[in-house]
Amino acid sequence: MATVLDTPVAVRRAAMDLLARREHGRAELSRKLRQRGASAELIDPALDRLAEEGLLDESRYLESFIASRARSGHGPLRIREELAQRGLPRADIERALGACEVDWSAQLREVWRRKFARLPQDAREKAQQGRFLAYRGYSMESISRLLNSRSDD
C-alpha cells in the first residue's frame, strides 16, 4: 500500500498530503518524505516550489507550533528546545517566540493553579511543584517568583 515516491509529482503530492493535515517545517517535511522513500534530488525542488507558492511557510509553522504548545501549557524554554530539535534555526525560533502574544507569566500561574491549586506546605512540595513547572518549560526565575509570591500571600 506504500506509494513509491520516485517522480516529482509523487513527491509533491505526498508533501501536500502532509501539509494538508497540519503545518510542517521544511526540515521535518524533508525528513518525512525521505522516510517514505523519496530521494533528496526530488525533495529539494518540490519543497522549493511549495515554498514559492506559499504552501510551505516556516514562519506560519513556527506560529502554529508555538500557539499549539502554549495552549497545552508548555513554557517558552520547552517550546524553544522542541523547535530546535526539529531543525529550525535559533534566530527564527527567537523571533517567533518574541512575536507571539502569549503572556507567559499568566500562563505559568494558570498551569500551576490547574495542577496544584494550593500552596506548597513544605520544601519537598515546593521542590515538586518547581520540578513540574520546569519540566513544562518555564524558567527557574519565574517559577521562584511565582512560588515565593504565593507563599508570601
Swiss-Prot record:
Fetch the Pfam families from UniProt.
RecX_HTH1, RecX_HTH2, RecX_HTH3
Query: What GO cellular component is one of the record's annotations?
Result: cytoplasm
Keyword terms: Cytoplasm
Superkingdom, natural source: Bacteria
Q: What is its main location?
A: cytoplasm
InterPro entries, A to Z: RecX_HTH_1st (IPR053926), RecX_HTH_2nd (IPR053924), RecX_HTH_3rd (IPR053925), Regulatory_RecX (IPR003783), WH-like_DNA-bd_sf (IPR036388)
Protein's cellular compartments:
Cytoplasm
Mind listing the GO biological process terms from this record? regulation of DNA repair
The protein's matches in PANTHER family, at most eight in alphabetical order, are given as:
REGULATORY PROTEIN RECX FAMILY PROTEIN (PTHR33602:SF1)
> What does the protein in this record do?
Modulates RecA activity.
Q: Which family does it belong to?
A: Belongs to the RecX family.
Which HAMAP family does UniProt cross-reference here?
RecX (MF_01114)
Put simply, this protein is called Regulatory protein RecX
Q: What is the lineage of its organism?
A: Bacteria, Pseudomonadati, Pseudomonadota, Gammaproteobacteria, Pseudomonadales
The gene it comes from is: recX
